[in-house]
């Protein structure tokens, strides 16, 4: 056989000096890449199972009083996947720039179990031990942690109080060309991602009030007579088919709204479904998928905003 392109199919082909070594090296590199990918997938699966087992062990030992311990486990999960520019705080109350006005009935959220915060430029208003008051401009995501049961009515009220918070348009900061005030057109406000974390599967229809629902399943565990079949995390986005342009509109409220038919079309092609990761058996690697999806949305928010106004008299 004379065609060199067919040599790999013919065991009788005589290789020139060095050709076999070169092909072996290429095969070795390919094998190493495959092994590396396999190890990454395996490690994420192991981490996922470890998180689930810790959550159920904590729940078995402490029962419904395990709130603090449970939050610590979820916190460790988020610390493992979000960039170091963010800090993850517990026992947070989120405020906006109008909360001090007597005529303003809103302005402070209910307590947030975990908040993913960019504290680089936006200061805490008040911090005393575990208790923190943080301006809405600094908050990229909020997390509500529950065990096996959840009350949708109270959770809806919890999310609504966060959505009611408004960002200031009077902040002042120095940019390259001098002092500027107010937000940039591409980001007029921030709307934190809302994430629910719980055990089992008996948390119905929460994906219509949360951006992500993260449920921990432990094999053979039984919750409300529903038996879990495997140990894993189930990640449920509010709508995995929402494109990145619509996420930008939802999270940042740009002004004017993006126009279709421009470069925005490129972002319209990408949805959270594009960031799903599967193994060879077509099983979703949930934690790795969540890593990519969450961080893509954090990059769209890209806090901090130049919007925070210190408290002042009206």
Residue locations for each model-derived region?
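Intrinsically disordered, low-complexity Ser/Thr/Pro/Gly-rich regulatory segments
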Residues: 2-111, 115-314
């Amino acid at each position: 056989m004379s065609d060199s392109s067919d040599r790999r199919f013919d065991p009788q082909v005589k290789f020139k000096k060095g050709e076999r070594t070169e092909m072996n090296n290429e095969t070795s590199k390919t094998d190493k890449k495959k092994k590396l990918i396999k190890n990454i997938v395996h490690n994420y699966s192991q981490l996922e199972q470890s998180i689930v087992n810790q959550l159920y062990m904590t729940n078995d030992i402490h029962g419904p009083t395990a709130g603090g311990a449970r939050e610590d486990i979820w916190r460790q999960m988020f610390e493992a996947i979000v960039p170091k520019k963010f800090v993850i705080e517990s026992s947070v109350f989120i405020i906006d720039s109008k909360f001090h006005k007597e005529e303003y009935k809103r302005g402070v959220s209910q307590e947030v179990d975990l908040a993913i915060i960019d504290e680089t430029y936006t200061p805490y208003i008040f911090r005393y031990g575990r208790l923190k008051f943080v301006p809405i401009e600094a908050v990229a995501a909020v997390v509500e942690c529950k065990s096996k049961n959840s009350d949708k009515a109270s959770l809806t009220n919890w999310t609504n109080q966060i959505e009611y918070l408004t960002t200031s348009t009077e902040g002042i900061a120095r940019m390259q060309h001098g002092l500027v005030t107010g937000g940039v057109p591409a980001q007029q406000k921030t709307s934190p991602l809302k994430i629910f974390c719980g055990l089992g599967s008996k948390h119905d229809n929460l994906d219509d009030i949360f951006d992500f629902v993260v449920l921990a399943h432990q094999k053979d565990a039984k919750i409300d007579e529903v038996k879990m079949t495997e140990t894993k995390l189930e990640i449920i986005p509010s709508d995995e088919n929402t494109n990145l342009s619509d996420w930008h509109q939802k999270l940042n409220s740009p002004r004017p709204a993006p126009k279709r038919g421009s470069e925005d079309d490129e972002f319209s092609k990408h949805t959270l479904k594009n960031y799903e990761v599967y193994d060879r058996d077509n099983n979703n690697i949930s934690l790795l998928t969540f890593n990519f999806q969450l961080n893509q949305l954090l990059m769209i928010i890209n806090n901090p905003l130049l919007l925070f106004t210190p408290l002042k008299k009206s």
